[in-house]
Amino acid sequence: MTTFTTRDGTQIYYKDWGSGQPIVFSHGWPLNADSWESQMIFLAAQGYRVIAHDRRGHGRSSQPWSGNDMDTYADDLAQLIEHLDLRDAVLFGFSTGGGEVARYIGRHGTARVAKAGLISAVPPLMLKTEANPGGLPMEVFDGIRQASLADRSQLYKDLASGPFFGFNQPGAKSSAGMVDWFWLQGMAAGHKNAYDCIKAFSETDFTEDLKKIDVPTLVVHGDADQVVPIEASGIASAALVKGSTLKIYSGAPHGLTDTHKDQLNADLLAFIKG
């Protein structure tokens, strides 16, 4: 396995395919780099170098007790980019990974970044507050935590067979393969790491990070996203990132990297080339 070690001694697994302009992918919760394989295979075949890492505590990376927070995730990404000495990189983040990309730019700037993309991403803020009335109430995230402690294997099955891919919608055609794929990745994450990450993706406010993004940015979101509702996320983020492009996928669920992979791949390629 290909890994590098962060300054705090955490081993981070990553895959690095192809050659050309580097495209870096940050994955969602509780998944890992494998969740981006459709996009990676497609873009590598188009002449790009594609890189994706397993966030600390997820997949094949180390499972440290501490450091399961967005600042550390962003710093891990920065160290990966520095380790590989990437320049002119395009950063794509899905769901929690979109927060990681935003926080990376907020903390480390865009000296090594050419463009960015937020896909079904959690910014600006998932949690409902007085300043963010369109967010989700704390009870939603407390429920996820409780379900994780009670039977996280079943939680991942329920998420994947229900709202994540939109399989709970009338007329939806479920895929047992997608459900198994989500579950397999989720169960590879450390339980403590995945548990802590719920707080990281739900309570981190990325508003100021988004305002610091000064490179061309693509925001992609499904208008049927039941996990990260579009109004308080994709639409709000696009309004905060100066000059961003918002693409709304009609009827698309949260997990559109799988359900709408061909459409997304084409849009990512056009954005990179544009």
From Swiss-Prot:
Residues 22-254 form the AB hydrolase-1 domain. Pfam families: Abhydrolase_1. The keyword Protease does not apply. Transmembrane segments: none annotated. Its EC number is 1.11.1.-. Keywords: Chloride, Oxidoreductase, Peroxidase. The keyword Transmembrane does not apply. It is an enzyme of class 1 (oxidoreductase). One of its GO terms (molecular function) is chloride peroxidase activity. The active site is at 95, 225, 254. Homodimer. Belongs to the AB hydrolase superfamily. Bacterial non-heme haloperoxidase / perhydrolase family. PANTHER family: HYDROLASE, ALPHA/BETA FOLD FAMILY PROTEIN (PTHR43433), NON-HEME CHLOROPEROXIDASE (PTHR43433:SF3). This is Non-heme chloroperoxidase.
